Curated annotation (Swiss-Prot):
The keyword Cell membrane applies. The chain crosses the membrane at residues 21-41, 44-64, 91-111, 112-132, 139-159, 160-180, 211-231, 235-255, 263-283. GO terms for biological process: ubiquinone biosynthetic process. Its EC number is 2.5.1.39. Coiled coil: none annotated. It is found in: Cell inner membrane. It is an enzyme of class 2 (transferase). It is a multi-pass membrane protein. This is 4-hydroxybenzoate octaprenyltransferase. Keywords: Cell inner membrane, Cell membrane, Magnesium, Membrane, Transferase, Transmembrane, Transmembrane helix, Ubiquinone biosynthesis. It comes from Coxiella burnetii (strain RSA 493 / Nine Mile phase I). The lineage of its organism: Bacteria, Pseudomonadati, Pseudomonadota, Gammaproteobacteria, Legionellales. The gene is ubiA. Its main location: membrane. PANTHER family: 4-HYDROXYBENZOATE POLYPRENYLTRANSFERASE, MITOCHONDRIAL, PRENYLTRANSFERASES.
Length: 287
């Protein structure tokens, strides 16, 4: 018999509710899309569904990730005390929790139109496959970018009934962004990952990691600039991009010596990048 009161702290850790930055990194692209699709005036229903869905799916994704990595996590110093790796949560408990979260997410998406439901099925498959890719390719961060950005076509489908070209332009920018911050994150564990056979862009880029991150950061901002021009956004949007540029330069400063605590700080700093881009979008539609 599961003692919920005793296990709840472990469940919350398994779902990473003790590390909310991951929720926001998933939420910002969702909010970008919800606001742009609705031209700055999203319906309360759609906004709530997508915000709640982001929180739930991030939690579910963390469970799948830890399930896939439970044997590898024991050999990486930073992850060896994760609930599944340490045994504080059983595989059965994790799967039951995942099933509950999936049911909640499915219930939410059923409140939307058919196209959004169909896209949601693809989104679930993207999330399920991602954790296993790091064994076979050095580009799991690219797949993560697609999975984390899949809420964008869903938001447009829910709002306007189809996925226009501008949605895919936003999607492209959003896909590149997680490659940036998850490469910074992977730099923390690079030595341990090499030992246990985990692949990542941090390992692929090697000593060119900062250069590649910089090129990706520039591509993100350039794509957003093109998006702003296409949508005729005003100066508020570009001020948001300017702040994002400053934050990205700060991240380059942080990772210059590739020290794990500084790489983690750079990763966390991306929350503010997403926030200021969203703030620029929000203020553009209000002025």
């Amino acid at each position: 018999m599961i003692n919920l009161r005793q296990q709840m702290p472990h469940y919350l850790r398994l779902m990473r509710f003790d590390k909310p930055v991951g929720i926001f990194l998933l939420l910002w692209p969702t909010l970008w899309a919800v606001w742009i699709a609705a031209k700055g005036a999203p319906s309360f229903k759609i906004a709530v569904i997508f915000i709640a869905g982001s929180v739930v799916m991030r939690a579910a994704g963390c469970i799948v990730n830890d399930f896939a990595d439970r044997h590898l996590d024991k050999h990486v110093q930073r992850t060896q005390m994760r609930p599944l790796a340490s045994g504080s949560v059983s595989v059965t408990e994790a799967m039951l929790l995942f099933a509950v979260l999936s049911l909640i997410a499915f219930t939410l998406v059923l409140l939307l139109n058919r196209l959004t439901v169909e896209l949601a099925v693809i989104g679930i498959l993207l999330a399920l496959v991602y954790p296993f890719l790091k064994r076979f390719t050095h580009l799991p961060q690219l797949w993560l970018g697609v999975a984390f950005s899949w809420s964008i076509p869903m938001a447009f489908a829910a709002t306007v009934g189809h996925v226009p070209a501008v949605a895919w332009l936003l999607f492209f920018a959003a896909v590149l962004w997680p490659i940036v911050y998850d490469t910074q994150y992977a730099m923390i564990d690079r030595e341990d990952d090499v030992k246990v056979g985990i692949k990542s862009t941090a390992i692929l880029f090697g000593r060119y990691d900062r250069l590649m991150i910089g090129l990706l950061q520039g591509s993100v901002l350039l794509t957003f600039g093109l998006l702003g021009w296409y949508l005729r956004f005003n100066y508020w949007f570009y001020l948001g991009l300017l702040v994002a540029l400053g934050l990205m330069c700060y991240q380059q400063f942080l990772i210059r010596h590739r020290k794990p605590p500084d790489c983690f700080a750079a990763f966390r700093n991306n929350n503010w990048v997403g926030f200021f881009i969203f703030l620029g979008i929000l203020l553009t539609y209000r002025n």
